[in-house]
Amino acid sequence: MRVRSGDDPAVDDPENSTFSNRVGRDPSHRLRPAATPRARVRSGPMRITTVGCGYLGAVYAASMASIGHEVLGLDVDQKKIDDLNKGIAPFHEPGFEKVLTEALASGRLRFSTDYADAADYQVHVICVGTPQQINGSGADLTYVHAAVDALIPHLDKCPDGRSLLVGRSTVPVGTAQILAQKLKDAGTDTLLAWNPEFLREGFAVKDTLYPDRIVYGLPDGEAEAAEAKALLDEVYKPMLKADTPLVTGNYPTAELVKVSANSFLATKISFINAVAEVCEATGGDVSVIAEAIGLDDRIGPKFLRAGVGFGGGCLPKDIRAFMARAGELGAGEALSFLREVDMVNNRRRDHVVNLSREMLGGSFTGKRIAVLGAAFKPDSDDTRQSPALYVASKLSGRGADVTVTDPAANERVRTERPNLKVAEDAFEAAKDAELVLLLTEWDEFKELDPVALKEVVAEARFIDGRNVLNPAAWREAGWDYRSMGRP
């Protein structure tokens, strides 16, 4: 069920710690027939814990504190907690450090490793990672269960009333029901809801404060659903007053919303990359094709840029976990197409490796190659499943002398890939290079002067793995320029 009362999603400046309430929700929209909640709902700011202070949890904690809630961030990593309490961001995310330091200064945000501190808080939000299993494709739920187990002894103690456990981590369908049973078996009266996140790295603060939709997965019982919804409505009160669309359903629906969204986005990316493969065989221009089909309002232009493929900690993992879970449930055939989505994505990375070999005359041995980009996307330092690092490592492993540069991820490269050289900027990386590859579309790489860069390389060969440069300008400057599915 969707709750909405207008079409204007605009909200006021989040720095004011409140949002506009000029657009209210239509009271005729209700989740279920009226029920009297047993949970007491605080009038005003809620007391919220976030369990897990990585990328998702830390951003959520600081953002919730910035709109007036009292927030405690919990994590087992003492150094991370110490840094966060000092206002030091453990990752690169535009706008996060400012929100973090302001929330700390307000006194509404603190971080701790002691789960006993959670006893005074009413809403507990699970934000831990669910990585791919080491020996399989499914999601590893170790951290989710550990977080809930650590919280259970401290639930039912909040003076504000009945507690609510909220899942935001991306999990296989059926996980919420297992956790609900875990709470019941432990004898706690705590409610459970699922509230999937839809954050984009590079836009995480904006996506938390100005979400394009909010999804609740609620218990089946009418009274418990009403109680859980009342507490969540208070958490998201500023956003709901600003007419953010609200979609409600049961646990499996909410769990499936997130993996379905990510699978659709991955499918769209792999589709245009498959078209790029056909263009490379026929002389077609995938960029023109993407523009033309993107003008169809049933399709839209987003996620239609061909390139070296997608990466990160979500899309690759989520489509594999979705397929694995569907197989466990006997519905594997329904998602068999996602296997090809994954294969197309991996094939594009190998295509760049093969194109590099071709441009270098058939051998990588001793060849100097510059790779521009290491993070899986711009405005992030996240190198998980990074296409850029995959390609760089493949080239290095086949005998090339590879130098990588990234505006935010250089330190991660030094730590994670010590076999790769690291440069501070594109010109340093490209010095005496025989091939330059652009694999993460940072603005500073898109704005490179082809004439100036040609002055520092040994051979003017360039692969634009993100289709973000002007082919004519680079060729006019004397480069052997190649891109993905463009003539």
Question: What residue ranges belong to the model's regions?
Answer:
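Structural/interface elements that position substrates and couple domains in central-metabolism enzymes
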Residues: P33, P37-P487
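Intrinsically disordered, low-complexity proline-rich regions
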Residues: M1-P45, K367
